Each structure stands twice: as structure tokens, then as C-alpha cells.
Amino acid sequence: MSNIKTRLQKARSKFSRRNSEASTRARSIASSAGSDRHGHAPPPPLSSPLRKSVSLPRLAEPAASGKALGLGAHGDDDDDEQLLVVGRAATESQADAEASTGSLNTSRDGRSSCTQASTAPSSSHDARKPSADVPIVCPQVTLDAPTPVHPGAPPAELDRPALPDSLSSTPSSVPATTTTTATTTATTTSLPPSPARVHRHAAITTAHAADARLATNLPGPDDSQAATPSGPPPSTARSAAMLHRKIWVKRPNASATLVQIREDDLVDDVRDMILKKYANSLGRSFDAPDVTLRIVPRDSQRAGERTLGPEEDMCRTIDAYFPGGQTVHEALIIDVPSRRTPKPSPRVPPYYHHEDGIHPQTEYFPPMSAMTPSPATMSTSLQHPHDNRIPVPQLHSISVLNTGQLPNLPSPGSTRRGPMHPHRPKYNRTHTASPTTLGGGIPSSATSVRPANRPRHDSSASEAKNSAASNNPIPTPPIPADPTPHQQTLQTSTPPTPRISSPQLNTKKKRRKAPVEPPALPAGLLDGSVPPINVLIVEDNIINLRVLGAFMQRLKVRWQRAMNGKEAVTKWKAGGFHLVLMDIQLPVMNGLEATKEIRRLERVNGIGVFSSGSSEAPNTRLGSDSKSQDELREDDKLGDKGMFKSPVIIVALTASSLQSDRHEALAAGCNDFLTKPVNFVWLERKVKEWGCMQALIDFDGWRKWKDFADKSENNDTTSKLSGSFTSVAPNKKAANTSPTTATSETNGVKKDAETERKNKRKSLGVVPQPVLREEAEPQPAEVDSGDN
């Protein structure tokens, strides 16, 4: 009784959920049984219980038939349960009649019972007990269409030789019975029901579950009929094949490769897969949006190849262009944008024998990559590989700075001196001490620096000598002044001495400067070093003015001063100045304005390069306006144009070191730029440079100044003239000397030398105008008072 009560409780709990479902499934089973392929007519008892209310006395016959079919009975308690399965029992009886050996009756909720045909019926494991308080009726259900139910599957341990016909007839049909094997005679026990699996279908395996999902998602007669009763169950590979696909792609003029995509992928998605496939060549340099795909139609009638848009469906496009399937020759072409970054030089492979040395190289890394093999090749390789390594010396100047090593020089230099003659002298390595790092780097560098050394190196040293003695000349990145001694020291350790010769050159230069520095020098040497030029110093600071005046005295040149730009222009108009040291920041008129005014006056009066004979542009420009031209001639006319042989040289003086100030000064017309404080050495060089230039431009005028200076020494009246007309040679009769006249006794010369110069040169000078004398007279007094 306990077993019966337990089953009754289970039936009561499930009756409420499956009340309507039982009748619906019973009707579905009845309809499917009537359309099965064996042509059996539906039994008459199936229709009446489903459409009419059935009373208790009339349920005896279906109950008895259920007991005879092996459903099992336990007295009157099983009658209520049989109401729920009356339609199912009738269907099962039809299936039992068709079976030849035995029957395995399976209920829709996963419960089954098996009986043997030749033995006595066994007790059923599937009896369910309805509760007493639930009304035992079979409700009448009217269905417009069969309810779709997922196809079920038998347990894994049972064979399935054939599927029921109901599966192929309609998707709502459910296989109700399965036959056991012909040799089975033993009674098999049914699987115990599980409450979690009682929803719509029984427990199925993973492979059958995939089939069930496939049938649900893709309903259709073709798919249902494809599952033939005799074929094996489909596997998960079929569903995977429906989701993925492979297409052929390739780079231009390259081999094709397969790329796996999905059925619903767009061209934009395919580009991501392509970058994964070409991870090195494309993935490191390009992004997916940069890649484009071109498709070439198979038919010649179609339009030419075109670029696929990122929004196109890839699979549909492939199917449209290639109906029979894409072949390897019809692969999509991958296009990427051309590189805009400069590529490395094609003449820079890891080894130098791939390069040609005709043009200079600027690559850094190739020499470094070939440093290791080059020392070995200098002793083992033939001459031909060395001849191919011509560009090595051109790259060495850079490799020395990068790594401090010169390993590649010896091997190419030992065999290819001839072809390198016109190129290697350009790259001198005297500025680096790197040759001491590796052996074999210097023999070729020593011979390559000077073309004359290379033929001697070929004649005196062989391949074996170069390889054997390559370690000795390591410290010689030579600049030998004499090629022959350098060649002799090539095989010895003495070559470092030519490197030390560079400081000796500096000492020689110092020796040359030494004669210039002493104040008392012979007149002949003075005439050759500092020409007798006239300098105008424009400076508003009295301290700077005195410093520059002292410099001029040491150089023994004539000079005058001006305190502002307007005064400088006025003094320049007097003529006779070769150099103007112009301060930029000045009162009244700054240095830039004064410079522009001087240049304008030079252009208007046609001085030097601005004369009509040398340049027509200024005159033409001024001739366009006759009135302004006449006014300029009246206001800006110079007194004696013979005093202006060439444009004056103007050097800007400023305490600012800004590049903009330099550009502004040069644009205003200055010839040079000098930053304060002034260095005497620099000033000395500039005075020589500009003075010699003026002497070359106006040699006749320079001779006039020299002759006039000689006359001034013998004429006392000339001592009253402006300092601009005073000779470099001092006048010994002058008791009070000033820096403007530069006539101190320390700067004087012997009378014998002065008389000799007067005898050699004849005076061609012209007496200066009195205006200059008036302007120059007050200046010595001011400077003298400042000096005192």
C-alpha cells in the first residue's frame, strides 16, 4: 500500500500540470497514427473519448485493454490514471499489433515499460495514482492545428534501427514506440523518471540535442526527410559547417591562402581575419580599415574587377560571383596603401659586397652589422669579394662615431685601393681615436685618406702582410703630411706621430701671430699686415669708445668717433672712411637707421657698386620720379666723390646675441655683426680683412692716403687737420698726442725709414677740404680730456 500511495502522490502533483497536455498529446498521437505509412485506419475508440464526456462505467473497456497491453493494474486505484493515458494506450495497442517480437511502450513523459511476448506480463514501473478529490473526466479539446513538439530520442543504450513515420510526416508528431532487436528475449527494465526531465521531451544525448536544435531552427520537409531511418545520426560537425566557411585570398602576385569566416560576416569582418592570417607582413604595419579587397569576376561578360565595400555580405558576394564555388585561382586580392615613409636604402644589406660605392652613404646600421665578418674576410677572402665592398669606407666615417670601431676598413682597403682613389680621400678620420678598438681597421684608412698613399701601399704590402700586421697599425687614423714616411710606418707602431702633428700646426699659427702683437714693428711689416685705413667708431658709451680707441691705437690705424647716428651720417658724408663700427642702440638716430641712410646716400650718389656703370637698377628706380630725384641730388649730394671709391663697410655692434637682431642688422645693410664685449683678436682680424679688401677695391685711394701721411710728417700745418687725414707714422714734433690722431711716440718709426718711403713714393694726394678740418678739430681735445 505504501508503494501505491507514493505513486498516487506523484500522479496528483503532475496531474494539474499535464491535464491539458495529456489530452493534446493524445490527439496529436491519434492524428499521427492515422497518417502512418502502413495505411492502418485509426481505431474508432480514439475519437469518442476525446470529444465526449466519458462516464466511469464506460471506462472499463479502455482500462481492460490497457491492462492487456501491459500497462499494469493495481485494482481500482489505477482507473484514474488510465483516464489520462486512454488515447495513448490505444495508439500503443496499434503499435503492438505491428510489432513481431515484442513491444516497448514509451510514454511522452519519459517513462517506459517493456514486456516479453511469450512470457507473463510483468508489473509496470510506470503506474501513476491520481488523487481522489480530482474529478476523473477526459476534457473535450478542439485543436485547429497540431501542437509542434520537438522530436524525442530513445535512450542511448537502445538501438534505433528505424524512426517512426510520424517524424517525417509532420513536425508535430512524436515517436511513440520503438522496437527492440529481434534477438532480445530478456525483459529490460525501464529508466526511472526524473522530475527535471519531464518537460516536453526525454533525456537525449549531446549529438541528438544538436539535431533537435537544428530541426527546430530550420523546419522544413527537406530537412526532416534528410534524416533517413537507416542513416547514422548527424554529428556536431554538420552544425559547425553551417556556421563557418573558408574563402581564398592572396596578395598581389603572391600565392593564395584560406581564411575562415562566418556565414554572416561582412567584408569589414573578413579584413580582421586577414590581418590575423598575415600577422607579420600586414598586421604589424596596417589596420583593418586600411586593407581593401578586390574581386575579379569569373565571367568575361561581367564588369571588370572592383573593390568590395566594407558593408557587403562576403558569403553572398562570393556565391554571386562564383556560383559553383570559389577556386584557388579566383582568390580575392588584398590591397594595402602604399608606404609613405622612406624605405631603407637598397644598397644597405648586412654585407658590404652588395653595395656600390659610387655615391656617398648616410646609413648608420649597415657598417655595424658587417663589423664582425670583415676582420675575418681580410685574411681569408679573395680579391673579388673585396672589390665588391667598395662602399665600406664611405660608411666608416659614420660607423666610427656610432660604435668607435673600424673593423671593415682593412679588408676592403687591402685589395681595392685603385677604385677607391676618387672617393676615400673625402672621409678623413683624424678627429676620432676609435682606431685603437679593432685590429685591421687602419691599414686601409691610412691608405684611403690620401690617394697618393694607396698605390704605394699596393706595391709595398701584400694581402698576407696586411692581414698579419693589421693589429700593429691600429692607432693610425692618419693624416700624414708626407705620404712616403706614412707608408713606411704602415707596418710599424710609429704612425701615431703623424696624428700629433695637428697641434704642431696650431703652434705654427701662434708663431705667425707673435710678430703682429708687439707694438713696435718695422714699417714694411706694418704696411703688409694692417693697411692704413680710416675707421669711424659710432658709440654713445664713453667707456666702450675708449676701449675701441685703444684697440685702434694698437693696430695703428686712423679713427674718428661719433656719439649718435645722425653725427655718424654727417661725418661719413665728409668721405675717406673705409670701416664703420656702428652701435645699434644710439640716441637721436639708432644704428640701423643710420646704416640705411648711408646705404641710401651711396645708392643715390652712385658710389661703388651703386654707380651707373656697375648697376642700372638704382638709377632707373630713381629716374621714375624726376622731382624726387632732383630733391635727393640737392639734399644728399656729396662734396667730393673722389673720397668715395666704394661703399663703406659697416660692422654692427650690439650686446644682444639674438639671431633675430643679427638678421635685422644684416637686412639694414650691415656687412658684419659683432657682439660686445669686443675681442681684440677678432677685431684685429676684421680690420685686416676689411682693410685689405678696401685696399684692393680702391688701390689708388689707398696710395693717396699713404703719400698724404708722409707729407703730414714734414708739414706742421697738417697737424691741424682731422684725424682721418693723419698718417699712421707719428709726428715726433707733436708734444700732446691724442688717440684720435694716433701719433704717440711709441708708435713712431725711424727717420731713415720715413725718408726712404718718401723717396720711393711720390705724392699724388689732394689737400682735404676745410670742412673736414673744422669737424675734426674739437675731437682730439675731448678724447684727450677723457684719457687724462
UniProtKB/Swiss-Prot annotation:
Pfam assignment, any one: Response_reg
Stored InterPro entries: CheY-like_superfamily, Sig_transdc_resp-reg_receiver
Key words, A-Z: Cytoplasm, Phosphoprotein, Two-component regulatory system
4-aspartylphosphate sites (modified residues): D583
Domain Response regulatory: 534-691
Compartments where located: Cytoplasm
Effects seen without this gene: Shows little sensitivity to high-osmolarity stress and moderate resistance to the iprodione/fludioxonil fungicides. Impairs phosphorylation of HOG1 under conditions of high-osmolarity stress and fungicide treatment.
Primary location group: cytoplasm
A biological process from GO: phosphorelay signal transduction system
UniProt KW Cell inner membrane keyword: no
Homology family: Belongs to the SSK1 family.
Free-text function comment from the UniProt entry: Two-domain response regulator protein in the two-component signal transduction system of the HOG1 pathway. Controls high-osmolarity adaptation and fungicide sensitivity via its regulation of the phosphorylation of HOG1.
Name of the protein described by the UniProt record: Response regulator SSK1
Species per Swiss-Prot/TrEMBL record: Cochliobolus heterostrophus (strain C5 / ATCC 48332 / race O) (Southern corn leaf blight fungus)
